[in-house]
Regions:
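Conserved C-terminal region and hinge/linker of Rieske [2Fe-2S] proteins, especially
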Residues: 1-164
Length: 164
């Protein structure tokens, strides 16, 4: 196998892994929907089920549940993952961006179409950097939050004070 064939082989594996990750997210979503079934609600703890019957470690199960929350907010990202066009690492990066955005989540989500498109062409680390920059750009407030925090503080952290 030459390098071109190895690269094609790895790309095929990546696509299959993305589709498997999407199926795990689908199973997680189904477990959650079973809990909220109005006819026959079933008590299910998705993490436990994923560990006991999905063959995952506790950490991997938590990651699946976390990714499920991300794809619930951004179903477009789940769709490209199911198509095999992006990876679970890209979904994780988007989740970190949502955490950074915090209260400015809606402003961050206005950039979602561009981010989803970028996730199909960028590496996970490049995409992570783009997501962080995008999230920080929507929460930037020209120092107003820093000023508000400083007004509430009851002590001085650094600097000289001159009392007259």
């Amino acid at each position: 196998m030459n390098i071109a064939e190895l690269r094609a082989f790895m790309a095929d594996i990546r696509t299959r892994q993305a589709k498997l990750d999407a199926q795990m997210l689908e199973a997680n979503a189904r477990m959650i929907s079973l809990m909220h079934d109005p006819v026959a609600p079933t008590f299910v703890i998705p993490e436990r089920e994923l560990v006991a019957h999905g063959g995952l470690t506790s950490r991997e199960a938590r990651e699946v549940v976390s990714r499920g929350l991300v794809t619930e907010v951004a179903p477009e990202m789940g769709a490209v993952l199911a198509a095999g066009d992006t990876t679970a690492a890209h979904v994780d990066a988007l989740g970190r961006g949502l955490k950074i955005a915090g209260a400015e989540r809606e402003a961050f989500l206005t950039h979602l179409p561009e981010l989803v498109e970028a996730s199909t062409t960028m590496t996970a680390s490049q995409f992570d950097q783009l997501v962080k920059e995008t999230a920080k750009s929507v929460v930037a407030d020209d120092g107003l939050s820093t000023f508000e925090r400083q007004k509430r503080e009851t002590f001085v952290i650094a600097g000289l004070i001159r009392l007259v």
